[in-house]
């Protein structure tokens, strides 16, 4: 339940008391005579239902504390939306009942009645009655439409016990409002107080009699004239604020049920408005519109009465919960639904109109018939293979011409053949040109039957199926390469040759593989020239190929040469002799692979020789082919072949 606007809330918190008009005094005879022409409007309703829960603690009233300040010493003001300048009448009294605190008031402001008459002439909801058993009364209908509830302005409930006997009034005024903070505070307007009390079933007969007897004694003519000086702009602003109260009509129905108000009344809690009749508004104002405006707004006299007679019974027979069957749909959503329904209906109508196929003729047209068989004898090229009639009187075979049926009769007609498929007007056998690969030996991965559809701008791409085939081929090649890496082929070991000066040496010298320190030579060590050689074609060395132990010819021992002096050049066919130039140290190779004998000889002492100046050596290390480079090459070739 949403809280009402601040304009319609009751001022229950303790604050500085508002100036209260002076008690009623003697009324001049002229003023009383002017008000005698218009009957006063009475109203009654609960300003608080004790048993109904409230939204705030300040809204609760203790019946014992309230009863101590009743009855009122005199009438209190009755205004609109708690506005002091909108004083429209007087509150005759507050009566404490078993169900709640009941209020009885009267409206006597002549300026306010004039404003109600002008508003009712322009309001469609005010002129729509929920029950036609009641006589039309524009003033009562407008009051129920605009100000359907009551709001009591009093001091805070906590200050009620100690406020008795003070100078501050306990109840300041009662306001007519669009929505009160307390539930069940709906007002019933009428011209008779007894008729108003009869609409509240929550009041017992004894309570109705006590209220009518106690508050009917002061005559409305004896009360002073209210000073209604509020501008229309302020009242309009309050009405606009009330229009933004959430679920206002639903709350108004709840208040009507809480107060137990029975029909018929002028209450507009369940009434839907009709379009306003501008002619009645103009007649009430006493003005005339231009002729063009009158033509645009005046309905046709033949249809005006009929339309109003059809609309009023509909509004009268509408149930109280009729608005619950309606839902609010945005305009865009409604237009979308409407367009969808129209499209569906259009397709359905077209299907019913052209959906049933038309019966084709018994004989197909000549254009779709099978051509006659060719003659058994050859025909000159370029002519139709029609049968040859050597007899002059022989009649050729003529086929009657049958026109083509309409398009709807043959939905599955074969499409026309292209020109290059025809030979002499007769379909020729299919021909597909031989595909010429971009390079010799290219593997064919595309099928001739595959056909790519039309491509639009931005869709120039290869078919997904062909790309998947290329990826599968690449995966198979990668798998083959991985398998080949698991079982690599033996590579020849590098044979080392020293980069020596061209000096004659007496004895030949072999230079096998250097130790591990060769790749990171220390200061003073001799570098080497590394080159991969074929051990069977190299000169000046012993063939040294890896192989299983004990198989083949005996291998020569692996030697390590330490250069401390003159270096000897290798000789073709030389053996492992000439220890005078360098000390040769024989050792057993690690890992089970050896070149030479399996026995290890003890080291021999090295004779000291005169050191030669260190020579600069160059290393040329040829790398193995990279597998990554090979994969990149294959991938690039595949991309080039696909483009």
UniProtKB/Swiss-Prot annotation:
It is an enzyme of class 3 (hydrolase). Residues 1-15, 290-306, 607-616 have a biased composition (Low complexity). Residues 1-31, 283-306, 485-519, 544-625 are annotated as: Disordered. One of its GO terms (biological process) is nuclear capsid assembly. InterPro entries: Herpes_virus_sf (IPR035443), Peptidase_S21 (IPR001847). The keyword DNA repair does not apply. Residues 623-643 are annotated as: Interaction with major capsid protein. Residues 16-27, 489-515 have a biased composition (Pro residues). GO terms for molecular function: identical protein binding; serine-type endopeptidase activity. The record marks 269-270, 621-622 as: Cleavage. Coiled coil: none annotated. One of its GO terms (cellular component) is host cell nucleus. Residues 324-343 are annotated as: Interaction with pAP. Keywords: Host cytoplasm, Host nucleus, Hydrolase, Phosphoprotein, Protease, Serine protease, Viral capsid assembly, Viral release from host cell. It comes from the Viruses. The active site is at 82 (charge relay system), 151 (charge relay system), 173 (charge relay system). A motif (Nuclear localization signal) lies at residues 439-445. Disulfide bonds: none annotated. Its EC number is 3.4.21.97. Region of interaction between pPR and pAP is called Amino conserved domain (ACD). The region of interaction with major capsid protein is called carboxyl conserved domain (CCD). Belongs to the herpesviridae capsid scaffolding protein family. HAMAP family: HSV_SCAF. This is Capsid scaffolding protein.
């Amino acid at each position: 339940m949403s809280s009402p606007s601040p304009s319609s809330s009751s001022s229950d918190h303790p604050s500085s008391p508002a100036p209260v008009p002076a008690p009623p005094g003697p009324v001049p005879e002229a003023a009383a005579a002017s008000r005698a022409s218009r009957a006063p409007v009475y109203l009654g309703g609960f300003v608080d239902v004790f048993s109904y829960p409230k939204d705030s603690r300040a809204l609760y009233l203790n019946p014992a504390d309230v009863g101590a300040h009743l009855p009122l010493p005199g009438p209190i003001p009755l205004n609109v939306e708690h506005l002091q300048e909108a004083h429209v009448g007087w509150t005759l009294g507050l009566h404490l009942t078993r169900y709640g605190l009941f209020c009885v008031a009267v409206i006597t402001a002549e300026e306010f009645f004039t404003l109600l008459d002008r508003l009712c002439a322009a309001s469609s909801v005010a002129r729509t009655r929920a029950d036609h058993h009641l006589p039309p009364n524009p003033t009562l209908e407008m009051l129920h439409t605009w100000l359907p509830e009551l709001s009591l302005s009093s001091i805070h409930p906590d200050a009620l016990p100690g406020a008795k006997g003070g100078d501050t009034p306990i109840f300041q005024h009662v306001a007519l409002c669009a929505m009160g903070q307390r539930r069940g505070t709906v007002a019933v307007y009428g011209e008779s107080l007894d008729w108003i009390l009869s609409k509240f079933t929550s009041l017992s007969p004894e309570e109705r009699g006590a209220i009518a007897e106690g508050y009917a004694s002061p005559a409305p003519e004896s009360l002073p004239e209210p000073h209604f000086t509020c501008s229309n702009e302020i009242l309009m602003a309050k009405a606009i604020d009330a229009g933004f109260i959430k679920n206002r009509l639903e709350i108004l129905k709840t208040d009507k049920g809480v107060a137990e108000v029975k029909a018929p009344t002028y209450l507009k809690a369940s009434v839907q408005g009709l379009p306003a009749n501008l002619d009645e508004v103009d007649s009430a104002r006493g003005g005339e519109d231009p002729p063009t405006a009158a033509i645009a707004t005046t309905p046709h006299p033949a249809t005006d009465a009929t339309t109003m007679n059809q609309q009023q019974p509909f509004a009268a027979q509408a149930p109280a919960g009729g608005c619950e069957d309606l839902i609010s749909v945005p305009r865009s959503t409604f237009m979308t639904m409407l367009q969808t329904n129209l499209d569906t209906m259009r397709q359905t109508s077209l299907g019913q109109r052209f959906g049933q196929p038309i019966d084709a003729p018994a004989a197909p047209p000549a254009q779709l018939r099978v051509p006659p068989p060719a003659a058994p004898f050859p025909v000159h090229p370029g002519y139709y293979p029609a049968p040859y009639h050597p007899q002059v009187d022989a009649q050729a075979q003529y086929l009657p011409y049958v026109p083509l049926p309409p398009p709807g009769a043959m939905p599955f007609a074969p499409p026309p053949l292209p020109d290059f498929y025809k030979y002499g007007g007769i379909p020729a056998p299919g021909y597909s040109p031989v595909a010429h690969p971009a390079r010799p030996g290219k593997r064919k991965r595309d099928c001739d039957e595959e056909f790519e559809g039309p491509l639009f701008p931005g869709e120039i791409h290869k078919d997904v199926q062909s790309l998947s085939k290329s990826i599968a081929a690449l995966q198979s090649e990668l798998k083959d390469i991985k398998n080949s890496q698991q079982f690599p082929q033996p590579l020849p070991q590098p044979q080392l040759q020293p980069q020596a000066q061209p000096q004659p040496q007496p004895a030949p010298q072999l230079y096998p593989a250097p130790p591990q320190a060769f790749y990171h030579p220390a200061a003073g060590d001799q570098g080497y020239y590394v080159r991969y050689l074929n051990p069977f074609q190299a000169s000046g060395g012993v063939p040294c190929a890896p192989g299983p132990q004990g198989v083949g010819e005996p291998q020569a021992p692996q030697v390590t040469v330490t250069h401390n002096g003159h270096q000897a050049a290798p000789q073709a066919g030389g053996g492992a002799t000439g220890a005078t130039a360098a000390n040769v140290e024989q050792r057993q190779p690690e890992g089970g692979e050896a070149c030479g004998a399996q026995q290890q000889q003890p080291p021999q002492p090295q004779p000291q020789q005169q050191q030669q100046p260190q020579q600069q050596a160059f290393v040329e290390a040829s790398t193995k082919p990279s597998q990554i480079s090979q994969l990149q090459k294959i991938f690039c070739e595949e991309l080039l072949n696909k483009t």
